[in-house]
Amino acid sequence: ALNSADISFLCLPDAAAIEAVELVENEKTVILDTSTAHRTAPGWAYGFPELSAEFEAKIISSKRIAVPGCHASGFIALVYPLIEAGLLGKDALLSCTSLTGYSGGGKKMIAEYEGYEKGAPLFAPRQYGTSQQHKHLKEMKAVCGIDEFPIFCPIVDDYYSGMEVTVPIFARQLKSGGIEDIKAVYAEKYNGPVVTCGDESQGGFLSASALSGTDGMKICVYGNEERILLTAIYDNLGKGASGAALECMNLVLGKEKNYGLSIKR
């Protein structure tokens, strides 16, 4: 089936994804892999076209495309442009907190949260990945080109979908500029249609589910001239997963990036 398809989406565990790719002999078949297996592999395009014209061009021309990880998508969207613009050095020591809905854990976790025997711990936020070995760390470091892995704090909470990924920085960590320069870099980089800049807060609160059910991403900058919060809001099932895969497919097919996607205006 893979060899007879024009485009195939792999939604498999890493080992199975690697085996599936090895079965493809048709040089015209385009593979979009949603697993972790090929996100930093040579010869594979990384499926985040908004990062640069080069990223987009590679997706369009490639037969092998790795769909970004949900947590990694937010971190990379925030950090990559600042490294590229020279505002943040590659030697920056960074941390990242990523809040996600329980659908990101797959069928087993969804069943745990929605089952009749739901335990008390599942009604509160739960931090995981405490050993600092989360599988998204590799692509976070590699794609951004930073020297060190960030300290990464993923948290799953009692709601279905939506992500809020925050990277805090001190202004003195910047090689040049300040909070307004960061906003300017993002505004130039992310002007739609899928990734945009703005303020998703309401009454001083920022909801991780603000873009639940959509395929876009909103980049927000908060703080002051000393301490700055960089935040990406999106759906872990949208721009963090299937929405990103469909966006890459659109590019391969010569369509607009947002064709068939649900984008909040």
Language model features with spans:
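Predominant activation on well-ordered alpha-helical scaffold segments within soluble catalytic domains
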Residues: I76-I83, L137-K141, K183, G243-N250
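N-terminal Rossmann-like NAD(P) cofactor-binding subdomain of oxidoreductases
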Residues: A1-L122, R126-Y128, C220-N224, K264
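C-terminal substrate-binding/catalytic lobe of Rossmann-fold NAD(P)-dependent oxidoreductases
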Residues: A92-L93, T97-S98, Y102-T231
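Short capping/connector residues at structural and topological boundaries
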Residues: L51-E56, R64, K107, Q133, ...
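Residue-level signal for short, function-critical loop segments
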Residues: C70, Q173, N236
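NAD(P)-dependent Rossmann-like dehydrogenase/reductase catalytic/cofactor-binding core
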Residues: G216-R265
